[in-house]
Amino acid sequence: MRILLLGKDGQVGWELQRSLVPLGELIALGRQETDLEDLDALRRCVRAHRPEVIVNAAAYTAVDKAEAEPEKAQRINAGAVDVLAEEANRANAWLVHYSTDYVFDGKKSSAYREDDPTGPLSVYGKTKLEGEQCIRQHHAKHLIFRTSWVYGARGGNFAKTILRLAKEKDELNIIADQHGAPTSAELIADVTALALYRISQSESHATLAGTYHLVAGGETTWHGFARHLLELVRARDVELKVQPENVRPIPTEAYPLPAKRPQNSRMDTAKLSNTFSLHLTNWRYHVQRLVDELVSQTAK
């Protein structure tokens, strides 16, 4: 299997470099090698490498900044994806793409299923949904993984920001009325590799194509995520300035941001679990692994 990975230096891309290697020949490219805003160059890149699988882990993810530069977000999250879908179809290659809970408006009272109506609230969400639609329009052999609240040991994310602030501040105010599942880049990468392996071994692999919700098990709030993370760090004797009682819950309206977020980011993963025979571990498991990794790095 010849795999072209785009976005190798991001949180998910970094983990994909590890998980995809056993599947065959991996060509991993980052921003320096491939500029997703240059659509002609992107097309030439795909044709030059002649992949059997394209894994697109590159995206415009600055949710609030996208409100001020929608054209750039659209070009990367939709325009570039449109090119990838066309080229995957031309080469009869599989295309793996990552989307987001932000394609939903968050008003549903229960977990979102893959076939629920979408209704993005932000430029970021709208461009990610447009990218999904480009893939479905151009190419049948695809996997679209919608995920949420992504974190990892590499790159910037909520978990690492909270750890930094907990060492600097006496008090933290964290949003407590948005619900979802913190999902590690490690889990996303491992599930991607397993899905591609199953496809490679299946005689009816076309039936496995489609959109799947890929998030960790369980649910929490941003406040619950932060509290649990800091409890684990404190248990490892890491000195924190903020005390547990000073990690305070606040409503969304108390922390206004340029881009609106869905209050309900819970996603039903039954389709993914049943199709690929997977057990998606509770979100706390991978948070523990993150803490272990970060603490061990600090100790070196």
Locations of the language-model features?
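N-terminal Rossmann NAD(P)H-binding glycine-rich loop of SDR-like oxidoreductase domains
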Residues: 2-20
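SDR active-site strand-loop-helix element
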Residues: 6, 29, 54-58, 95-100, ...
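Adenosine-cofactor binding site in Rossmann-like domains, unifying the SAM/SAH pocket
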Residues: 21-44
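NAD(P)H-binding glycine-rich loop region in Rossmannoid oxidoreductase-like domains
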Residues: 39-78
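Catalytic helix-loop patch of NAD(P)-dependent Rossmann-fold dehydrogenases
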Residues: 75, 79-83, 90, 103-145, ...
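NAD(P)-dependent short-chain dehydrogenase/reductase
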Residues: 136-194
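Mid/C-terminal beta-alpha module of Rossmann-like enzyme folds, strongest
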Residues: 191-192, 198-256
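Amphipathic terminal alpha-helices
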Residues: 281-300
